[in-house]
């Protein structure tokens, strides 16, 4: 039974990974459009603006650098996209003309990052695997720091096998609050959306043991993986998690 539930959750996470899904939505917008602009490039631009809503020219240049590295080419592309009414420009920032539907946004908020596993992760046998059951294989090295060099897989597998559960007292009595210190990571509106999604996820995992996967950074430090539920979260997030197996520790 758990394997079917696990696969269903992973399918949702794979479908609603944030940027890939927004690029897909951008592609749907431009698919039938009558334009001479490169539709693949246009879909990517619209995807970024669906995420950020508005961006300065310098930010757009950074986001699109791998796609259109030529400054003059990008400038002409943005001008044409504005003239053809795919985006707006207010003199300072490029602004999206499209919004994600409320239903789609809710799914993105909930499934934009792989959720904790309901069953013990698959054994990681090489650097390209990640412990999940569907073959995504994001690897155990964070970001783009892929390597074929030997890393300690035994440690990753040991951490992955630790069974966890929610601290129901903390779920019911503790509260996550936005502060100005969070402004660099998310604004109040984004925080409120995150909070709503997190509460739904916590309800889904109530009374259900779960597992977190782990990855290394390029320096060899290990990090638990998770967005709504993560050991290495803020104080509120940390308070939500208990070991499933408990022992009384005596002097």
Where are these regions (language model features)?
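Non-catalytic nucleic-acid-binding interfaces of large nucleic-acid enzymes and RNP effectors
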Residues: 1-251
